[in-house]
Amino acid sequence: MVATAAATAELQVAKDYVIADIGLADFGRKELNIAETEMPGLMALRAKYGKDKPLKGARIAGSLHMTIQTAVLIETLVELGADVRWASCNIFSTQDHAAAAMAAGGIPVFAVKGETLEEYWDYTHSILEWGDGGTPNMILDDGGDATGLVMLGSKAEQDITVLDNPSNEEETFLFASIKKKLAKDSSFYSRIKAEIQGVTEETTTGVARLYKMQKSGELPFPAINVNDSVTKSKFDNLYGCRESLVDSIKRATDVMVAGKQALVVGYGDVGKGSAQSLRGLGATVCIAEVDPICALQAAMEGYRVVRLEDVVDQMDIFVTATGNYQVIRNEHLVKMKDEAIVCNIGHFDNEIDVASLKSYEWDNIKPQVDHITLPSGNKIILLAEGRLVNLGCATGHPSFVMSNSFTNQVLAQIELFTKGSEYGKEVYVLPKHLDEMVARLHLEKIGCKLTELSKDQADYINVPVEGPYKPDHYRY
């Protein structure tokens, strides 16, 4: 495969990988070894399933941030028998030493921190093409880009006009990449779609895309919503963001968070973790919400619930965490105070209307940190160009909490690959007993000892002694 060089890295291009620097592999391996000690769930799955290889025959196209923690996930999938190809799901989220460690270990990986949008879609195509002419039969997705590429490409095979009117820069490059592929192979996407046995989706944004396809009757294969496993959403989204948000803001700006006025837009699990993160360092935190239940939760936690437009000229730090688009628009951006910090911890870059800032003066301070001069003369500090700040400006969530999420991913891949015929073309969640198993696998590492129910106690509350302990409708 041939690729152009990313602006920020000299690429090493080999037959079946594209990374920044293979010389970083040893560094990546050392960090990977440390991460393994903090990821007991994945290591337990290797011990439990490594001999039986339940994923033997699985060809997994992985589109998920190429980090050290993801490297542990990849090697777990391989240990369980899978054949894997990998790309990052964000142009800024790759850790180049992690990608190098994977390439050195023989994993076809296509990921460079700071890759262009054109390269991003080239790399996503690369995970769909096996060297022997084969195709993936499973997708492991984060944000839905790999799944969406297959689906949109299939539509374009029937009606190329679906690619006529891109609505933003991202779509411009996506549509161009599909046209380029179809010019070479007019049935590429439909062949892949026909072979996919199932998709497992990591995050809120991608799950929303899957449910939209299910509702319209367009979902062509079963999917597991990993995001809404309790041991994902209530841990990764909440506790992961609680640690990684302020880590990224401080790495990027070196500002003192204490004493600052901060606005978190969105108070779902990600917003809750983000608000705790900022409050924990002494910021005065306000919340903007559309959902009355989430707004009331925020108020009960002592946050002021406000409208963005009412406080936009007062805040020092803005964080979007909604999964929606055009949440902070130009009408808000131009009113911000001097040196306000603006960032996003949702999935895509369109929560903040970054496109509307392109006509202003930009001064790049360092990678993923830009000073933008507004018409008022005030300057704002935009982090990661509005993309995921915790992966663009730092290294994402800690290994331990990602072990929860990725243990769910592996179990979901096993479930759909080995029992796919038992599932319809719908979106599912993992059963409660597996959710509890994921939690159980992580307790010993942090010194927890579970109390055990007696048979009489279990009978009294009508649950098995060994669990599950809560009904599916229980809200943790």
UniProtKB/Swiss-Prot annotation:
Pathway terms, separated by semicolons: Amino-acid biosynthesis; L-homocysteine biosynthesis; L-homocysteine from S-adenosyl-L-homocysteine: step 1/1
A cellular-component GO term for this protein: cytosol
Residue numbers binding NAD(+): 203-205, 237, 266-271, 289, 324, 345-347, 390
Cross-referenced Pfam families: AdoHcyase, AdoHcyase_NAD
Keywords: Cytoplasm, Hydrolase, NAD, One-carbon metabolism
PROSITE patterns, alphabetized: ADOHCYASE_1, ADOHCYASE_2
Keyword Nuclease: no
InterPro entries for the chain: Adenosylhomocyst_ase-like_sf, Adenosylhomocysteinase-like, Ado_hCys_hydrolase_NAD-bd, NAD(P)-bd_dom_sf, S-Ado-L-homoCys_hydrolase_CS
Location within or outside the cell: Cytoplasm
GO terms (BP aspect): L-homocysteine biosynthetic process; one-carbon metabolic process; S-adenosylmethionine cycle
Domain of life from the UniProt record: Bacteria
Gene3D superfamilies in the record: Adenosylhomocysteinase-like (3.40.50.1480), NAD(P)-binding Rossmann-like Domain (3.40.50.720)
Catalytic activity: S-adenosyl-L-homocysteine + H2O = L-homocysteine + adenosine
Record's signal peptide: none
Ligand binding (substrate): 67, 142, 202, 232, 236
SMART domains on file: AdoHcyase, AdoHcyase_NAD
Swiss-Prot/TrEMBL cofactor(s): NAD(+)
Cofactor binding note of this UniProt entry: Binds 1 NAD(+) per subunit.
CDD domains: SAHH
A single GO molecular function term of this UniProt record: adenosylhomocysteinase activity
EC number: 3.13.2.1
Family: Belongs to the adenosylhomocysteinase family.
Main function: May play a key role in the regulation of the intracellular concentration of adenosylhomocysteine.
Protein name: Adenosylhomocysteinase
Record organism: Synechococcus sp. (strain CC9311)
